[in-house]
């Protein structure tokens, strides 16, 4: 993995006077509002999708609602497969195209604004934050595991990412098209829903263990096991936006390092390059000093005056605007080009949805 961060080369200073912020930081309030809104959106999509599935399971009886293509945001593997297909053929896939557009939107978000998808939008990330809060109330704290073990465990998500990318990367365009056009591929979204509706004992135990682990170690799933987050982190290494510290304005209180959910040594660095940084701005919110810490673009060579430092920092409203640009841009572009919904008839859904539990993975069928 790439170098985590850029260390400060300036010598340590004596205790410096505090120049307090002119205005309180509202980044966390704004972020929590965005998280809540996206959580509600996902809840609405999930409820609509459930009603849509039940209509076909009942043989066409009851209320019919349209299939919300936005649920394909929960199909990152389909999004990756469709992206590979698009890059190989130049054709937009007919099945689960929304998965690809949302995938590309989230990747673009990470390319410009670090892993902001993980800390501002992802429902799993939001739930993980909630569980960490539960842990602080129940256990009195969350725990930091030894650094050597932490680094080793973080490698797991990259191994999972490598498995998926190597497997999908080795598939031809014809194989990708065949998989997505198979009954299993067509019903990938319904399969996902049924996993939660008909969860087995083993899956329930694993999820329960992950929930408990997330109350003990902050963002346990995201930090150690999420391959989607691993991909976003690698992409985010190229982001021009980073957490940047003004060594002269910093009073060396270390509040930023204590606030960082990823456990990064923000107080010892000039800029944070780590793939673990999610641009959550918790460190910025914790900083009591005016302009000492910013989520900011790289300074221009000509910019040396302290007054320009503040102008480089991204305010929460700008962060929200960038996130909205990539998310809504992907959705609106797909809708405008008529590539948002899968090209599958109602009759086909009527045949396939009730049979979803009997559908096997194509690779299993071949054997």
Residue ranges and their predicted role:
Residues 278:
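Short alpha-helical catalytic segment bearing the HExxH-like zincin motif
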